[in-house]
Amino acid sequence: MNSKDISSKKLTLQGFSKLKLDFNLSSSASPSMGATIVKKRRRKTHDTEEQDENKLLGSLTKKEQISRINAVQNAALLKERNLKEKEAIVKKDSIVKEDSNEKTNDRDSATNTSFKETGKEVLNDVSLVELIENNTDNEDNNKKSLKTNKDIYSKHSKRIIAQSIDDKIEQPSVFKQRFGIRNRKSEFTKGKNISREVIIPDEITIKELSIRMAEDSKSVLKMLKEEMGENYGVDGLVDPEVACEIVEKFNHTAKRVSGANKEKNLFFIEERESLPKKPKPPIVTFMGHVDHGKTSLLDAFRESNVAERELGGITQHIGAYQIITKDKKITFIDTPGHEAFTAMRACGANITNIVVIVVAADDGVMKQTIEAMNHAKAANVSIIVAINKIDRSQSGDVERIISSLPQYDLIPEELGGDVIVVPVSAKKKINLDKLEEAILLIAELMKLEAIEDCRALGWVIESKIDKAKGISATLIVEEGTLKVGDMLVVGTAYGKVRSMVNHLGQREKVALPSSPIEITGLNGIPNAGDKFVVVSSEKQAREIAEYRLELIKEKKEDLSNNNLDMFSRNDSEVEELSVVLKCDVTGSIEAISNSIDKLGKDQVKLNILHKAVGGITDSDVLLAEASSAVILAFNVKVDSKIRDLAKRKGVEIHTYSIIYELIDDMRMYLTKMLKPVTREVRIGSASVRQIFNVSRVGNIIGCYVSDGVVKKDSLIKVMRNNKLIYEGKLKALRRFKDNVKEVGTNFECGVSLDGNVDIKVGDILEAHQLVQEERVL
């Protein structure tokens, strides 16, 4: 019986009996088809099953009986069709296997098509059941067809349909492709491993190592635990040697790169020989003793008045300027002449091409003049001597200075050497043109050239913190072209160039060789004299800066360990003055630090707890309070709020604008902290003339004071034939019968000494006194 016969006829009780008989016969003849469903559910014999069915059907209404029979019949038909389709699928699969050239995609497509057709047939069978139920309702009630209560049979029907679908879909790959589900992880892990070259730095975490190998961090941790017996966290640092072993176990190649390799060739310009070079302006540095007119001479070239604005009449920063003269550019660097700025002068000598040693005609060669000469000679740069202030010098001063230069290994042209000497006057602008010609002549002879088409490198002149700009640094480009947006590393600081301003305050986008430029964008404050270089990425800049910072940290730890024993031995004896130092620029910090460090002695020392560029902050005051320190502010303004806070906390703040005033005050502070020195001073002497034995008192020594004075609290030394036979204190000092405090020269006195002393006539008594003297640094 097919589905069309069932759907076209109404089923009566007589029809049901006949259908039941046919169904039982088919079930006994073919157990695998529909009968197994009933047996599986009830698990009874054929006779018992038939009785139970009659009983069950008798308890149901006519409508329910017909619906139950129709459902069972359709389930049997569905099972039979599914079996046939399953056999067809198996046959197709065998054909596909025999044909090795046929693509698997064709097979999947055919299977998917079969799956869709089967789904349609299942839906048709469900519709067939609903149609029979509707026909039965029309026969009994002659009303509109009513839908069957699906809640009674939905669970049973769903189980039959789901079982039929499961029988048809036995291949998981077909089901997964039908619904788009794939085991992506298994497919990924089965892929072919790629061998990589893994860079191993001095320090690396498990997470970073896993990323570089393109491996799962869990696999790395598991391997470490199982094969090496090590327990690590994902963010834990691993030894470089262990990291190399891990890389090799994952079939990769390890390349060990130490921090030193990061610095290697950092300042090397690739293809230097092939890149074109262009002439660059000379960098000229004015050096010399304090107040010899270096800044005034530079002002005469620049036609400005910087010297008049400088506090104390001395330069305390390195200044960089660029002027145009005779259609040629010259970059000038002005360095401080005070002895505290030795590091700045050394920095200026290393950066420059030409050094102009400025000597005042009335003072001649001084201490810092000699130091500047030594810096210039050590840097192997050309030297010009400018004898300034000739407008107020006396006759013969210039000749005297010229004749003294050879003793400093500077042979002037007047004496057959190659050092140009130019007498000038910055105030009267005398011979400035001759000095300018000398500079341009030497620059032309030196043939100064630089590559412009390469990454920039150069030097830091000075750095500071500005409230509006943040951290800024003044640079001199040595080679290459510096641009806004370049990533550079300088000392332990790095960052992207955010802005560039020239010495006139004008914004620039590029800076060529020998150009002084002020930049912003660094994450830290570099030191004057640090060398900068443009790098390819922020990662490279950060790694180099961190490596340098680590080196500095290691050096400090070594120094601390070496001095630990010394400090522990002397800690109880050494007085310490702690200070917090805040300055306007890094150059001032270095100069002041070096100067006040030299003030310390064995019994007193100055400890700089913290030094930084910028204004005084709340944390500075709190640090000073906790450490009983003094705050020194150099060229830094102090807010009223900070002063109030310091007053409440009992912290002293001393502000300075001239460096030697700060140094003098620190010397005075340390001097007051020094313990006075106790010295033994001879104050007089007396000769023994007679010895009296007094009962109940002892020996009384009769003396004559030959010089000085003998005091009652004097320390007495008894000398016999220039040998010390006794040292002690006076027990009593009398003149006649009266006790006196002292006896002067040419007077007689009687003394008694502590202890038993063998005194003879002719012995000499020397009177000494302990005197405390203030120490001076």
Curated annotation (Swiss-Prot):
Chief place of localization: cytoplasm
Region (G3): 334-337
Keywords tagged on the record: Cytoplasm, GTP-binding, Initiation factor, Nucleotide-binding, Protein biosynthesis
GO cellular component: cytoplasm
Annotated segments matching region G2: 313-317
Binding sites annotated in the UniProt record for GTP: 288-295, 334-338, 388-391
Bias type Basic and acidic residues, positions: 98-109
Annotated family: Belongs to the TRAFAC class translation factor GTPase superfamily. Classic translation factor GTPase family. IF-2 subfamily.
Described purpose of this protein according to its UniProt entry: One of the essential components for the initiation of protein synthesis. Protects formylmethionyl-tRNA from spontaneous hydrolysis and promotes its binding to the 30S ribosomal subunits. Also involved in the hydrolysis of GTP during the formation of the 70S ribosomal complex.
PANTHER family in the record: TR-TYPE G DOMAIN-CONTAINING PROTEIN, TRANSLATION INITIATION FACTOR IF-2-RELATED
Protein name (database record): Translation initiation factor IF-2
Lineage: Bacteria, Pseudomonadati, Pseudomonadota, Alphaproteobacteria, Rickettsiales
Gene: infB
